[in-house]
Design a protein with these regions (language model features):
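Hydrophobic alpha-helical transmembrane segments
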Residues: 1-67
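Alpha-helical transmembrane segments of integral membrane proteins, especially early/N-terminal helices
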Residues: 6-22, 48, 78-89, 162-169
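Secretory targeting signals
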Residues: 32-48, 54, 82-143
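Membrane-interfacial interhelical loops
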Residues: 34-45, 94-117, 155, 159-199
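Alpha-helical transmembrane segments
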Residues: 58-65, 130-134, 160, 202
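Transmembrane alpha-helix boundary signature
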Residues: 61-70, 99, 103
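Membrane-interface helix-boundary motifs at transmembrane edges
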Residues: 68-81, 137-147
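Central hydrophobic cores of alpha-helical transmembrane segments
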Residues: 144-159
Length: 202
């Protein structure tokens, strides 16, 4: 008896999943030499959240349509959702590993805050993005329409936050996808506030 259904085990070797894994890993490697973002902290977490948004949506839509149209899967919806949660988070394993190794050699600066930002921003973002992509996949009739709907929602959400920041520069922005941005003018040291915890918890 197989512990993992072929639908799931095959997906872990599929091209879409490997592309997303390599993209997030490559992004982390590109960011590492760059000052400010090349250490585990808010800036690195923010950029990884943006990358993870698209990556998670891409693999979620692909997997859901595999599930919908592969009639012999016999996988119920709950099993699909339970697989999606760790799957979404798995795309962040290599970026986190790379930045921890780099930060370990260069000397950790605010390690616990940086790790907390990584959990609160990209990790929570992947779960939110997976949920939205799942909904889009269930509502749309094909991958293209699901992808267009997903991108429209993401751009609409992020665009609204950017518009608010442009109109009111001193303001900060909370967003389900990129997480949090303290505004164009912010202190060098960004701390985790109860408001951020509540916003990401919701």
């Amino acid at each position: 008896m197989k512990l993992v259904h072929p639908l799931f085990s095959n997906f872990l070797h599929s091209k879409p999943y490997l592309i997303v894994i390599l993209t997030t890993a490559a992004t982390a490697l590109i960011l590492i030499p760059i000052p400010l973002v090349g250490d585990i902290g808010f800036e690195f977490a923010l950029l990884m959240a943006l990358i993870a948004t698209g990556g998670t949506g891409f693999i979620t839509i692909y997997l859901v349509f595999q599930w919908r149209f592969y009639q012999e899967t016999k996988v119920n919806f709950l099993s699909l959702v339970c697989f999606l949660l760790p799957l979404s988070l798995s795309i962040l394993i290599l970026p986190l590993t790379f930045i921890l190794v780099k930060s370990g050699f260069s000397g950790f600066c605010n390690f616990y805050d940086g790790l907390a930002f990584f959990v609160l921003l990209p990790c929570v973002t992947t779960l939110c993005s997976a949920a939205v992509a799942l909904l889009c996949s269930l509502l749309a009739h094909n991958k293209l329409r699901a992808t267009i709907l997903f991108i429209t929602i993401i751009l609409g959400s992020i665009g609204t936050s950017i518009y608010r920041l442009l109109i009111h520069p001193p303001l900060f922005a909370y967003n389900p996808f990129f997480g949090y941005f303290p505004g164009p003018i912010y202190d060098e040291i960004i701390v985790i506030t109860p408001t951020l915890l509540i916003a990401r918890g919701l």
